[in-house]
């Protein structure tokens, strides 16, 4: 089967949707499919084009059997609303010529956000007369409005219209949690158009490892410490000030260290907040290379999932499967009625505390510090749940089955538009 993945983010970006789409593409290739990826120049999370791609309009690559077609992005490191719009539009226009540089796909899968990617992907779908599968990782503009990231009324109206168009244009919509399905059905999307395939984790890559003789611990002088780890995106939805304030509450326990790993620029503001609050038990570190991820997770005693109170209920952090697979207990400072809380509770791999409550977070961390048996129990339950529900192989099975069903059903009837064969062979 020829599969086209249209994703703004892809390897070598270390966090977010990029590792997931990379694993999906490479996993499908290993199963005998031909996969082409149309993507932008790598820039996340620094919001700067990586050095080796800077100044280039188009780059074609082959990695682990996947054909990668990159196109130019207009990007600013500190974007305003106009910059964000121009960034997405630049990808729309520069990625369009890529349609002429590959075989006709049997299916197209588009990751959202960004929403504007719907436009070229839909054009591809029409030209190729093949089904478009919308892979929804976040529901926009609703989620951005809720946390105050998007306030411009014209932009909200535009994105709302684009959201409706995307749902209509897609043959199938894959979502990552049941809460997404409920949201879409409430917006009038037919329930039979939606399939839930959770984000996954490579359980062979991320697995429980001993924290003793751990090189990551040794490098950062954490030997003998009780490490509470937050690693990932630092954005409006997180509110990591809560983590720093919780660390201050536990300064009297010298063994406990909080480690926050994220993009360097975002860490600068947290550094100021640490100094202001006297949080000398917080270690701030830049994002680590992906190959260091298993070692870093193994270095922790507890993993954190952090959200603000106003985060929309269906938000589902992709780091939850990672932490569960690592065999470390989770402390989820998240809204109790949200998708993240439900996922953690269902896994049996963590404890939920009130969001934006440093005292609540500190109390649970201290309880886990004092109770190694509970830590082991939660970690083991979380790992087992990840193996049974979040493995990469299960996700590949479900996507492969979805693609096959869609292609088989369409094969019985001719499309309205003619097939557009770009190349043969």
Q: Residue spans of the language-model regions?
A:
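A short helix/loop element that forms part of the nucleotide-sugar donor recognition site in Leloir-type
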Residues: 51-58, 207-221, 416-417
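Conserved donor-binding/catalytic core segment of Leloir-type glycosyltransferases
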Residues: 222-238, 244-247, 259
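Nucleotide-activated donor-binding/catalytic signature segment of Leloir-type glycosyltransferases, i.e.
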Residues: 253, 261-262, 267-294
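N-terminal subdomain of nucleotide-sugar transferases
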Residues: 1-56, 60-61, 250, 418-425
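A short, well-ordered alpha-helix in the C-terminal region of glycosyltransferases
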Residues: 360, 367, 374-388, 401
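Nucleotide-sugar-dependent
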Residues: 238, 287-298, 303-324, 329-342
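Carbohydrate-associated surface elements
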Residues: 41, 179, 200
């Amino acid at each position: 089967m020829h599969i086209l993945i249209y994703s703004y983010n892809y390897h070598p970006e270390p966090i977010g949707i990029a590792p997931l789409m990379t694993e999906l593409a490479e996993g499908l290739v290993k199963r005998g499919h031909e996969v082409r990826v149309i993507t932008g120049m790598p820039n996340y999370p620094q919001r700067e084009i990586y050095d080796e791609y800077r100044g280039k309009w188009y780059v074609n690559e082959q990695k682990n059997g996947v054909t990668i077609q990159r196109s130019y992005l207009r990007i600013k490191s500190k974007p305003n609303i106009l910059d964000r719009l121009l960034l997405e539009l630049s990808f729309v226009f520069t990625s369009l010529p890529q349609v002429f540089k590959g075989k006709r796909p049997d299916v197209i899968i588009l990751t959202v956000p960004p929403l504007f990617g719907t436009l070229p992907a839909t054009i591809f779908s029409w030209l190729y007369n093949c089904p478009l599968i919308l892979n929804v990782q976040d529901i926009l503009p609703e989620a951005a409005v809720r946390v105050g990231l998007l306030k411009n009324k014209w932009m909200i109206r535009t994105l709302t219209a684009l959201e409706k168009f995307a749902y209509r244009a897609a043959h199938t919509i894959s979502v990552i949690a049941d809460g997404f399905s409920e949201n879409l059905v409430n917006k009038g999307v037919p329930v039979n158009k939606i399939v839930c395939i959770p984000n996954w984790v490579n359980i062979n890559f991320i697995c429980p490892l001993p924290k003793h003789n751990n090189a990551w611990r040794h490098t950062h002088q954490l030997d003998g410490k009780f490490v509470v780890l937050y690693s990932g995106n630092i954005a409006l939805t997180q509110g990591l000030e809560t983590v720093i304030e919780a660390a201050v509450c536990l300064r009297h326990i010298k063994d406990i260290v909080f480690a926050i790993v994220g993009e360097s620029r975002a860490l600068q503001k947290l550094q100021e907040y640490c100094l202001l609050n006297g949080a000398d038990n917080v270690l701030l570190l830049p994002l680590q290379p992906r190959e260091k991820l298993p070692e870093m997770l193994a270095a922790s005693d507890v993993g954190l999932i952090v959200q603000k109170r106003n985060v929309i209920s269906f938000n589902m952090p992709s780091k939850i499967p990672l932490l569960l697979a690592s065999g470390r207990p989770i402390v989820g400072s998240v809204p109790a009625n949200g998708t993240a809380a439900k996922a953690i509770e269902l896994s049996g791999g963590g404890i939920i505390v009130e969001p934006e409550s440093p005292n609540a977070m500190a109390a649970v961390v201290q309880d886990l510090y004092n109770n190694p048996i509970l830590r082991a129990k939660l970690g083991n339950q979380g790992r087992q749940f990840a193996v049974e529900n979040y493995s990469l192989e299960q996700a590949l099975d479900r996507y492969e089955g979805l693609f096959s069903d869609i292609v088989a059903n369409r094969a019985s009837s001719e499309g309205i538009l003619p097939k557009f064969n770009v190349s043969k062979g």
